[in-house]
Structures are given as structure tokens and as C-alpha cells.
UniProtKB/Swiss-Prot annotation:
Function, in words: Cell division inhibitor that blocks the formation of polar Z ring septums. Rapidly oscillates between the poles of the cell to destabilize FtsZ filaments that have formed before they mature into polar Z rings. Prevents FtsZ polymerization.
Keyword check for Transport: no
InterPro entries recorded: CAP/MinC_C, MinC, MinC_C_sf, Septum_form_inhib_MinC_C
Keywords: Cell cycle, Cell division, Septation
Protein name per Swiss-Prot or TrEMBL: Probable septum site-determining protein MinC
Region feature Disordered, mapped onto this chain: 1-28
Subunit organization: Interacts with MinD and FtsZ.
Native source organism of the sequence: Thermosynechococcus vestitus (strain NIES-2133 / IAM M-273 / BP-1)
Gene name as annotated: minC
Coiled coil: none
Length: 266
């Protein structure tokens, strides 16, 4: 018998990658959960949080998502957080702010449909914009429904740079510093010193009023009317700003009731 001829086994050819560029990994920028987005809007970012996940489930997903998105910016930018009907307390807002800070982002404004979240955010010093409730969440009632008819009550001082937007009246127990602003569809009541901007009746309500213990606002607005407080300011005492045919008038609180009664008489 003749020995079987052996066939040499071909070795696989391995091409050298020396000097060639490595193929980069594809970055995952798709949200890990539905409804979690981070969008650039004119020098700011808008972070949208879904409302259908518990915080304990959303929190780790949010952290991973921020890691996958941090290539999108190269400087510290303000962030508006739109959390819809999600209820966030102060500790959760602080967690969120710290997570954003780790990625060179700064939490600046909370956009929410929950009054409790708005109060927590304002107490921590963030600007607040309260949204109207979706129609399905508004309880049916006789006549036109008012989605956010309840006033927003805040027991805090509004520092410079803070903005409060609300679709009803706003009550502040504390001062409103210069550089802060309140925009309300209803009345504005400041149980303290008003030095910032106050815009009552922002949706056209000329019957709205601005009331404060000390009127030293940089700007007053009622509906589309505009006024400034006297310079130099008068001695501090409670005053009321209200709209008339001649524009915005300011009256001492102890006489305003009498003035209002006369103007409202038939």
C-alpha cells in the first residue's frame, strides 16, 4: 500500500491593521425607554421624562441615556425638564440636577402639570412653568373646564433668574427679588416685597390684580398693559395694582376696596 499523500492545510490570512484606522463603535443614542428624550432648542436643552415609569425604574435608565448623549454638547448649557404628570419631590429633583451636572448640563427650569412638583422646584430655586392638564385628566364639570384653576401657593423667596409661569393665580409668601419674574393668568399676591417683574392676567384678563406688602417692582403688567413703579419708591405699605381705562393704577390696599367698589358700581 502506498502512503496517502497529505494535503497541506491553508492558514487563514490575517491582514495587519497597523497604520490603518480602527473602525469606531456605533454609538447608541436611541432612548432606552419610550418617551425619554433630550433635544436642543436654541441654546438650551429640553429633557422630557416619561410619566409611565416609577422613579426607581427610570433613574438608572436616565443615567445610561445621559452617558450616551454627552457627545452632543461641548459646553455647560441650561436644561428645561418637562416631566408632565410625573410627581417629583425635592430629593428626586436634586438627584436629577446632580446627574445633569456630571455631564456639564445645568438644570434650570421645570415644566410640569403637577402643583406639588412645581412647589418642590420653586422651593429649590428652579424656574417653573406649569402646564395645563390633558383633557382626559380634567374632571368634567358644568360649564367650561379649568384645567389648572387652583392657585399656585409658594412659601419661598424667588431669587434673581427664577421665573414662575402658572395658568391661574400665584401666591408667594416671601420676597420676589429683582431679576425674578411671575407670569400668571390670574392674580398675583406677594406677601412680602415685590422687586421683580409681575405679569397678572397674562392671557388677557384685565380684571386681574397684583397685590403686595411692598410694591417695588421693576415692571408691572396686567394683560397687555405695562407700567413701572414710581422712582424713587414710596414708603413701604401694602398696595394693589389694577387695570383701568387710563392704564395700570396703583392704590394703597386700605383704599383700594373703596376705589374698586366705586369703579364697579353701575
Amino acid at each position: 500500500m502506498s502512503e496517502a499523500e497529505s494535503t497541506p492545510v491553508e492558514e487563514p490570512v490575517v491582514e495587519s491593521t497597523e497604520g490603518s484606522e480602527a473602525i469606531p463603535e456605533v454609538e447608541q443614542s436611541t432612548p432606552l425607554v419610550s418617551g425619554l428624550t433630550l433635544e436642543h432648542c436654541g441654546g438650551r436643552y429640553r429633557l422630557t421624562l416619561p410619566s409611565d415609569l416609577d422613579w426607581i425604574d427610570l433613574w438608572p435608565q436616565l443615567q445610561l441615556y445621559l452617558v450616551g448623549q454627552e457627545h452632543l454638547w461641548s459646553e455647560t448649557l441650561p436644561v428645561d425638564c418637562a416631566c408632565g404628570q410625573r410627581l417629583l419631590d425635592q430629593s428626586q429633583l436634586q438627584q436629577l440636577a446632580e446627574a445633569l451636572s456630571e455631564h456639564q448640563l445645568r438644570l434650570d427650569r421645570i415644566i410640569t402639570g403637577r402643583r406639588q412638583t412645581a412647589i418642590a422646584a420653586a422651593t429649590l430655586g428652579y424656574s417653573v412653568q406649569q402646564e395645563e392638564l390633558p383633557p382626559l385628566l380634567v374632571k368634567e364639570a358644568d360649564g367650561p373646564s379649568q384645567a389648572t384653576a387652583n392657585p399656585l401657593y409658594l412659601k419661598t423667596t424667588l431669587r434673581s433668574g427664577i421665573e414662575i409661569h402658572h395658568d391661574a393665580s400665584v401666591i408667594i409668601v416671601g420676597d420676589v427679588n429683582a431679576g425674578a419674574s411671575i407670569i400668571a393668568a390670574g392674580d398675583i399676591i406677594v406677601w412680602g416685597r415685590l422687586r421683580g417683574v409681575a405679569h397678572a392676567g397674562a392671557k388677557g384678563n384685565l380684571g386681574a390684580r397684583i397685590m403686595t406688602l411692598e410694591m417695588a417692582a421693576t415692571q408691572l403688567r396686567i394683560a397687555d398693559l405695562l407700567a413701572r413703579t414710581p422712582d424713587p419708591p414710596r414708603p413701604p405699605y401694602p398696595e394693589v395694582a389694577y387695570a383701568t381705562d387710563q392704564g395700570i393704577q396703583i392704590a394703597p390696599a386700605y383704599t383700594w376696596g373703596r376705589v374698586f367698589a366705586v369703579s364697579a358700581a353701575p
